[in-house]
Amino acid sequence: MKKNWFCNILLTLIVSCSLFIQVAEASPNAAFAKPQQRVDIGGRKLHLYCSGTGNTTVVFDAPGSHGGWAWFKVQPEVAKHTRACVYDRAGFGFSDPAPRPNTSENAVEDLHKALQVAGINPPYLLVGNSLGGGNAQVYAYRYPEQVKGLVLVEPQTEDETERLNKITEGKIKQFDAMWKEVNAYCLGEAIKGFKKGSKALANCVGNQVTLYGPVLGKAVASIMMKPTYWQTRVDESNAFNSSDEQLRALRKPFGDLPLLVLTRGVNENAIPGKPQSAMNKAAEDENEKIHKEIASLSTKGKQRVIPGASHIIQFERPAAVVQAVLEVLKLIE
């Protein structure tokens, strides 16, 4: 979820989710650390990275505040079976910023144009985590003839904020406000220029080498030091409500579209060795209920809990995500 209060609050606000620190391993794939294919979509360029061959192209959309590097543990494995593409939304990674709101509809339009220009033809199997999961649903509604399957990893949905905010007695919206404050703070520091060894650098950028390994980590850190990156985070978070409303306006059954929804099996706010609070348990139950509702929108929909994984499942249990993608791919082909 885009406003997942179950993460450790401080680290969540700084580097998106504390679980990255605990579970990320060094990436053996330096391809994610540099531009691969920058496609002109009308005066600005969107970055794509594809590898593998096959009749169906798997397209990955990252969680909020991330570029395609979020899939560095999954994309190479899927590419052993078919063509697999990651992309950077406008303003992230190696993509140019957009002179318009960073909503789901606009992200989908950008991706659609980029795939066309790059000659990456359908059918597509879309895979999205968190905000990327919301975008994948919007794409499937806008271009149903192109999308032959969906794998939604802890996906954003149009009413999750209100439902979980009610259960958590306002904590979701409190987190949203803190998230925006931190983004604004880091944007200001990026504009001034991060200084080596500074508290601002540690708080806003962190140790990406620990997260992604020496090559990719250095590249991600370099991107996170740019004002463009933080401005895009500000813009994207400001557009969350609009993106929710766009998905709400499109919402309808998916028919018989192969669909697999992956749900976290770990409550990130639970203290190891201590009983889970009633509020945490209620929120986890509601999160799973929301995902089951999404899966029920397709006659070929399934929902699966991934034990040991939290919100960013592709970091903690990448094999489970790869397995899900290959299962849906088999149904398509």
Predicted regions and their residues:
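Bacterial N-terminal signal peptides
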Residues: I9-S18
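N-terminal cap/lid segment of alpha/beta-hydrolase-fold proteins
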Residues: P28-K45
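Conserved HGGG/HGGXW glycine-rich cap/lid loop of the alpha/beta-hydrolase fold
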Residues: I41-F94
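Active-site loop/oxyanion-hole signature of alpha/beta-hydrolase fold enzymes
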Residues: S51, R89-V127, Y143
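Alpha/beta-hydrolase
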Residues: F60-A62, Y87-R89, V153, T263, ...
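Conserved hydrolase catalytic core segment
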Residues: N121-I167
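Flexible "cap/lid" subdomain of the alpha/beta-hydrolase fold that forms the substrate-access gate
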Residues: V151-E293, G301
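Catalytic active-site module of serine/aspartate enzymes centered on a nucleophile-bearing elbow/loop
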Residues: L297-E333
